[in-house]
Amino acid sequence: MSHDDLLQRISINPGICFGKPCIRGHRIWVSLVLDFLASGSSIEDILEDYPQLEREDVLACIAYGADMARERYVEIPLQKAS
């Protein structure tokens, strides 16, 4: 599945989930899926907890997060080299 095809699985609608990016057809925020992955959950763990999702939905969240990281960044204090 191409990157563009994956992103078709993400929806942003002001009337759904407060306009937050979510998985199309579901009220599951992209950020929630990314938080699960960041905390150590595997794709399989997420699919077990959310059986209505498909593997490609989780991959779409990762692709969306990667695109956002290319466009924006979070301020993190610089660490001095030791």
Q: Model-flagged regions — what are they?
A:
Residues 2, 11, 31, 39-42, ...:
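Generic serine detector
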Residues 55-79:
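C-terminal structural segments of small proteins and small subunits
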